[in-house]
Amino acid sequence: MKVFLVNTAAILAGALFFAASFPNPLFNYGLPLLAWVAYAPVFWVIRRAGSTDTSLKKSGGGKGIIAALAVSALYGALYGYTAYRLLTPWLDSVHPLAGTFASVFQLAVMAVLFVFLKLAVILYPRKGYLLQWLIWVSYEYLRTIGFLGFPYGITGYTQWQYPLLIGIASIFGIWGVSALVLFPSVYLGAAFPNKNGVSFSKKNLLFFYRERLALAIWLGALGASLVFGAIQSNYIEGASTGTAKIALIQQNADPWKNDASETRRMLGVLTSLSSKALEDEPDTDLVVWPETAFVPRIYWHLTYRDNAESYALVKELMDFLAVQTVPFLIGNDDARLEVTASGKWERVDYNAALLIKRAEIMDVYRKNHLVPFAEHFPYEKTFPRLYQALLDTDTQFWKPGREKTVFAAGHLRFSAPICFEDCFGYISRDFTRNGAQFIVNLTNDAWAGSLSCQVQHLSMAVFRAVENRRSLVRAAVSGQTCAIGPTGKILAMAPPFTETALNVEIPLPTGSTPYSYWGDFWGILFAVFAAMLLLNGVFRFILRIIQTGREL
C-alpha cells in the first residue's frame, strides 16, 4: 500500500508540474524552467511499476510482465486525466463537458503511452530510458496529426520565452526543443531508486557514472543550441531587406455572442480603432481585423441581399473601406453557393480572411485546418447522433478550404493562418514555401475568457516565426495581439482584454530554413527509431523465450 501511495503521489505531482510548466491560471506565462524536470516523477514511477527485468525467472514470467504493463496503464490513465484537466480548464467555456471529454481522451492515450514506456525498460533494462525519450517525443509528434490533432501540451512550447534556446526550431522544428527539454526528466527518472525505497544507494549513484556519455552529449547539445541561437539571431538582424508597417485591431468582444445592434456597435469600434491607427501611422501598409471580427457574410450579402439588416451592415462596412487607401485583412464568414453532397445548390460557409482594398474583395483565404468538433465533424453519417448533439450546442460548422493563399498587397506577400492553424508547423511552412514574406494570424480566443488560454496559444505562434525565419503578427479579438520577430522575440504586444489598436513595424528577412525545407522530418525520425527499437526488443524477447524453452 505504501508503494502505491508513493507512486500515486508522484504521478499527481508530475501532472501538476506538467501543467505548471505551461501558461496557467496561477502563472500566466508558465514556469518554463520547471519543464526540464517536470516528467521525472513520471518516468520514476514507470520504472517502479511492477517488474522491469526481462529475466522470466525474476519477473514472475509473462504474468509478471503483463501485470507490470497493466499497472503502468493505470498510472498513465491517472496522469493523462489529471494533467490535461489542469492544463486546459478553459475548455469548459466551449461546453460543460468539453474539458471532461478532452481529459478522458488523454486518459486513454496516456494509458497506452505508459504501456510502451514500461515496455521500453522491460526490453532494455539498462538503456531503456533512451527509448523512453524517443517514445515520448514520438508521441508528441503523432498527437499533432489527423482529425484529432491537438498540439496543446507539447513540451517544447514551454520554452517560448527563450529566443536563444528555441533557435534550433529553424532546423528541427518544435521536436528538437522538446527532445532537449525532456531528456533531464528521462535521465533522472532512470537514476532514482526504482525499488520500494526512495533513498539513493551506491547503485543509483553509479548510474550517473555509467551513463555519463549520454549526459555529456545532452550537455553538448544544449550548449550548441544556445550558441547557434546567438549566431542565428545576429545573422537575422542583418539579413532583413525591408520592413512592413501593420495596424493590428483588437475589439475585445466575442463577435459570435452579440445580436444585430451589438454587431453594429462593434463595427463602430473596429472602424474607429482602425481610423485612429491610420491617423497615428499614415504610411501603414496593412490593417488587420481578427478572426470573424465582422460576422455578417460580406460576399454573400453583397451578392444575394437576402437579409436587409445584414446587407445594411455590410454596406456600412464597405462605405468605410471605399475611402481607405490602405488594404484591410478582415476575418469573416465567407459564404458561397455550391453543389453539396446532396446534389443541391446550397450555401456553404468558410471561416475566412478577406483582403479588401477600396471596397473590392481582392483575395480570400479559407481556413484549411478546422478545430475538431467545434468547427468541423466529417463523420456525420458514421456518428449521426453525435453530429446532431454538436449542432444542438449551437456549434458553427465550416467547410475546410483547400488553397494555400498568399496575399499580395503592394510590395508585400503574406499568408494568414486562422486561429488554431498557427498551432501546427506544417501550415505556416507551406505558406512560406509558397512565397509568404511574413505570417498574419487572425484569432479569437475570447470565448475562453482566460489569459492563460491566450498565452498558451501565443506560445505556439512564437515557434512558427522561428521555424520559418519569418516575422509573425497576431490580430486577436481579446489578446494576445502582438508582433513576433523571426527569432521568436516578442517585438510588441497590446494589453489583453482591452479595445485597442497596435501599430507595429516588422522586419522582412529573406531566405529559408532547414525546417522550411524538410518540415517535420525530425518528428517522423523519432517515431521511426522508436518503432524500430521496440520491434527489435520484442523480437529479441521472443527469441529469448524460444531459447529458454519457457512459456509466457
Stretches found by the model and what they are:
Residues 1-234, 450, 464, 476, ...:
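Membrane-embedded alpha-helical bundles of multi-pass enzymes
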Residues 2-6, 219-280, 446-457, 462-467, ...:
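Non-cytosolic juxtamembrane linkers/loops
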Residues 26-41, 85-86, 250-251, 283-303, ...:
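Short, conserved active-site loops that position catalytic residues or coordinate cofactors/metal ions
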Residues 28, 241, 323, 346-348, ...:
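A generic fold-level signal
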Residues 89-99, 124, 144-172, 310, ...:
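Active-site catalytic loop in hydrolytic enzyme cores
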Residues 133-134, 286, 294, 306-330, ...:
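CN hydrolase (nitrilase-like) catalytic-core segments centered on the catalytic cysteine
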Residues 229-373, 407-410, 416, 420-422:
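Soluble catalytic regions of membrane-associated enzymes that act on cell-envelope
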Residues 340, 361-364, 370-377, 429, ...:
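Membrane-interface helix/helix-cap signal primarily in integral membrane proteins
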